[in-house]
From Swiss-Prot:
Its EC number is 1.1.1.86. Involved in the biosynthesis of branched-chain amino acids (BCAA). Catalyzes an alkyl-migration followed by a ketol-acid reduction of (S)-2-acetolactate (S2AL) to yield (R)-2,3-dihydroxy-isovalerate. In the isomerase reaction, S2AL is rearranged via a Mg-dependent methyl migration to produce 3-hydroxy-3-methyl-2-ketobutyrate (HMKB). In the reductase reaction, this 2-ketoacid undergoes a metal-dependent reduction by NADPH to yield (R)-2,3-dihydroxy-isovalerate. The active site is at 97. Belongs to the ketol-acid reductoisomerase family. It comes from Xanthomonas oryzae pv. oryzae (strain KACC10331 / KXO85). The gene is ilvC. One of its GO terms (biological process) is L-valine biosynthetic process. Its cofactor is Mg(2+). This is Ketol-acid reductoisomerase (NADP(+)). Residues 1-171 form the KARI N-terminal Rossmann domain. Mg(2+) 1 binds at residues 180, 184.
Amino acid sequence: MSNDTQPKIAIIGYGSQGRAHALNLRDSGFDVTVGLRPGGPTESKAQADGFTVVAPSEAVKSADLVAILTPDMVQKKLYEDVIAPNMKQGACLLFAHGLNVHFDMITPRADLDVVLVAPKGPGALVRREYEIGRGVPCIYAVYQDTSGKAEQFALTYAGGLGGARANIIKTTFKEETETDLFGEQAVLCGGASSLVQAGFEVLVEAGYQPEIAYYEVLHELKLIVDLFYEGGITRMLEFVSETAQYGDYVSGPRVIDASTKARMKDVLTDIQNGTFTKNWVAEYEAGLPNYTKFKQADLEHPIEEVGKKLRAKMVWLNGEQQAAAAPANQQAA
């Protein structure tokens, strides 16, 4: 490294996280260059934000620390074709997700430090919290410490994002990758969306109005998740009725029982042994035929059409200040 405390940083990618990282690090006093494909969709945005934007191959040449903040499935080719041939000796390679390294799709050069820094929040939140003087918690890991200073640089980077204002927790590439994938698949995305769809179907098939079903199983979910977010499950239970609490206690375990937990363990096993990643890479390389089919099925689920109509009347969602001037009986969903 050319500077032990203030490395020259190249941010490769300028999506939600890339933009937040670049802006926060620059505001923290770092020399930041953004590496993007010339003429790409985010080049003008980065330039408008005041960054020097060059091709990734140029950005990495003089950087002490290179942060790869592109989508997972383009990182292997990007590293092999652009980053590895051009990164200077002894620099630090940083990831925000460990999938490619942990599952051996990327084998970093032996002379590089290799670390991970992952804010636990979307890019917009990472930026917003930084701007108001707070920060989003970060996790970090060291995969390869050639210089003996890899951990220091991971912590410096996390601090530059604002993570030190909140909380920084050490992990490993293995732990971050496997728990992140499991959370997405079994709970946050796959589990939650399948639970909502199933609940909607049960109510509609029992003869209830689709609009009422939507409100009960999807719309009100935000109220519960916000309470989870603020204070855990116990806070949620404090703010719902005793009837809802009792229903939670007696019916929750009927829906999510030992057999559900066993299947969740199967999901985790497929993640741990690389089956999921192997299948995902094969799917991507085949042109995403199943992914496209699954996505279309979700788009065509009845809950989507119902939700679209109901959300059109939720003026707070689209920034409108008042509902359309129509008689009250015409405003009903």
